Amino acid sequence: MRYAWPMQSADSLEQLRLKLAQFSSERDWDQFHSPKNLAMALVVEAGELVEHFQWLSPDESVNLVAADKREVAMEMADVLMFLVRLADKLDVDLIEVADQKLERNHLKYPVEKARGRATKYDKL
């Protein structure tokens, strides 16, 4: 499916994947989108996200002013887009692997042992 600009909002990871692939292809950026480069870009964007919280108290981090919240949202979008692009390049279904990981975590962190605790699974 080809999208015209401005693109309609994506309502699934698959639509977002397709839109990002088209965006990259139209600009001949696939040559730069190796898994290594995408992973590095993802980490850079995650670092930019963390910068917004670096010196805030836990309460301040929950109660961001609107302008800061918008900037945080934009950094979150950058992280998501690089993650989706990386998954596309490595042919990883993010929903499928997230479900698998959640199931593993369910087994590692049983409610009766982990509830209300921030302890690693091997120390429960």
List the model feature ranges, each with a label.
Residues 1-76, 80-124:
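Flexible "arm" and connector segments at domain edges
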